[in-house]
UniProtKB/Swiss-Prot annotation:
Substrate binds at R18, D19, S172, H201, Y292. This is 4-hydroxy-2-oxovalerate aldolase 2. Residues 10-262 form the Pyruvate carboxyltransferase domain. Keywords: Aromatic hydrocarbons catabolism, Lyase, Manganese, Metal-binding, Plasmid. Mn(2+) binds at D19, H201, H203.
Amino acid sequence: MTFDPTSDRLYIQDVTLRDGMHAILHMYGTDSVRTIAKALDEAGVDAIEVSHGDGLNGSTFNYGFGAHTDWDWIEAAADVIKNAVLTTLLVPGIGTAEELKRAYSMGVRSVRVATHCTEADVGKQHIGIARDLGMDVSGFLMMSHMIEPEALAQQALLMESYGAHCVYVTDSGGALDMDGVIARLQAYDRVLKPETQRGIHAHHNLSLGVANSIVAAQAGAVRIDASLAGMGAGAGNAPLEVFIAAANRKGWKHGCDVMALMDAADDIIRPLQDRPVRVDRETLSLGYAGVYSSFLRHAEKAAEQYGIDTREILVELGNRRMVGGQEDMIIDVALDLIKAKAN
């Protein structure tokens, strides 16, 4: 895709109010949602994603119950957003067509349909319904590090064929490096239409969230996911204010006020964190083992319950190639580790 961030405008997609849910166990209050959404809107981001961390209808026993419903959160954000595109995320099998239609009725105009990187076909119906509603639609290929670039590109091609306007390289495990990101976007270029946008969703588990987003833009990614103070699963997403500062230094075009983003990150977001969103031994283990970032809090809970090291659980999850949706297996892994030690 021919895209030059020095002459073409980046599309900055904030994920503080969706991926950021994972960082505080989906406990955002509606007042906080209003405050954050207003700050983001005034700072000039292009789109603001709002839902449970696991997407529409994600508030369940398996993923964790939210402090409010998706509808409460979406309504709170819609009350204050004046310019940004209200966006949500849907994982087929968790969210349904009915939730998608309800979100649209509440003002959501963009959706990311998220599947595991080998399962683009399960998003066909939801992408089609979103297009029929007139929504902007992105295909979101989660855990993109788990398959080779050419295989990922074939999945991206499916999402394009279903009607996605944009297809993401989604580094859910924060396990990709810059070469891996570039290789995947170059593979996209070999099969996707020039008019289909590319996107990058980075996690910071190896401290490469910003670097991966920078090289993604240089490789043709128009849409850049990021969050205030990196608020997100694991070590968080690419920190929005940091990415924008780096983009400014490169002379790239976007609509964001970096100072306003810095203020929102430090004054609004960091005080909400009950566990610091940072690279530490546990979150580093996510990227090292290539594990789904939202497993972090579940694994820490299991480790505390059974008296074992969180890192052991995370590494074993990586060895077993567990993916999003298998949160219920974390307890099984912990018990297997205890049994192995006893023997």
